[in-house]
């Protein structure tokens, strides 16, 4: 796995997160927390769960397990704006760390502080990305059902927008 490819995949993840939060800005407070039938969580809980997973893996991969243990609570995020602020910090931290990595780092075996499994670092990062894609699809489904679709969130849509210089960063 090349570093530039991994950074691009994380760029896509953060672009989709931004689109989801932008769409969620248009929801009434009761829509943000409305019970879901199409997914296992309401929109707020889905987004908080995704952020929680992203937050927890960075310290795990840096052998700082105790920092990744505290689980975020959905009720601490009353709206998309409060969630966005917390996500911005996570994105900064993750991007700062990703910028320190090389292709060799990505291919090197690491031991997750939580699972104690030894795998190449890139495999753990792909786990973060694929988990995000699942949660993002759930969030997009809920937003669309509420009348505020985030639009196309697939990877090729991101690439087309990026190539056209329209991808938000």
Predicted regions located by residue number:
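Acidic/histidine-rich alpha-helical segments that form the ligand environment
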Residues: 75-143
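Short, contiguous alpha-helical
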Residues: 7-73, 115-169
């Amino acid at each position: 796995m090349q570093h530039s490819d991994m950074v691009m995949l994380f760029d896509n993840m953060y672009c989709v997160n931004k689109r989801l939060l932008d769409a969620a800005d248009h929801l009434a407070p009761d829509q943000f927390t409305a019970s879901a039938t199409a997914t296992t969580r309401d929109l707020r809980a889905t987004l908080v769960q995704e952020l929680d997973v992203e937050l927890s893996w960075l310290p795990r991969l840096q052998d700082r397990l105790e920092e990744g243990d505290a689980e975020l609570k959905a009720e601490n995020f009353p709206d998309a704006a409060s969630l966005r602020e917390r996500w911005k910090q996570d994105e900064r931290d993750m991007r700062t760390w990703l910028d320190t990595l090389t292709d060799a780092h990505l291919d090197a075996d690491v031991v997750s502080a939580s699972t104690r499994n030894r795998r190449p670092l890139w495999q753990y990062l792909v786990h973060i990305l694929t988990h995000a894609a699942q949660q993002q699809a759930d969030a997009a489904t809920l937003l669309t059902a509420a009348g505020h679709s985030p639009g196309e969130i697939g990877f090729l849509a991101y690439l087309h927008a990026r190539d056209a210089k329209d991808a938000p960063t």
